């Protein structure tokens, strides 16, 4: 999938396929919730354990992403968010991340309201980012994946 990264540049994000091939034939869709018929059984497992994100380590290696930073979004959704809150443009200052402060506290987003809440977490991260904050996010991400701890 194409996502928008640092400086507003598009890049291809790598993920394991978790949805059926024609899942977005009617246009881009938000996160698939419980019982979404577009999700495969293997895909549900991958998403529940955040394993669908592993291929993004290649994006980190290529320099498109960082380990920690705001999650990259598709242009379609960025346009919707920017209509409500133009501060989204500040996120283009840094590389998007495989994990983020917003994902830990806001989870997956399936509504515009949740996307705007995620933006507030991302802006908080942008203002307060430091090595210590990044280490805390890495630790919390590990706890979330290994033990299912929610924050």
Predicted segments — roles?
Residues 1-151:
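Conserved small/aromatic sequence motifs within transmembrane helices
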């Amino acid at each position: 999938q194409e996502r928008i990264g640092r400086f507003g540049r598009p890049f291809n994000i790598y993920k394991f396929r978790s949805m059926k091939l024609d899942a977005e034939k009617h246009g881009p869709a938000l996160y698939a919730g419980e019982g979404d018929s577009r999700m495969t059984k293997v895909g549900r497992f991958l998403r529940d354990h955040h394993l669908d994100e592993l291929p993004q380590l290649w994006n980190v290696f290529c320099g498109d992403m960082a380990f920690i930073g705001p999650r990259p979004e598709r242009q379609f959704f960025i346009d919707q968010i920017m209509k409500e809150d133009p501060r989204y443009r500040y996120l283009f200052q840094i590389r998007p991340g495989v994990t983020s402060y917003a994902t830990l506290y806001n989870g997956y987003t399936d509504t515009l309201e949740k996307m705007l809440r995620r933006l507030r977490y991302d802006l908080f991260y942008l203002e307060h980012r430091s090595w210590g904050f990044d280490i805390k996010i890495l630790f919390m991400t590990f706890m979330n994946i290994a033990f299912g701890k929610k924050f």
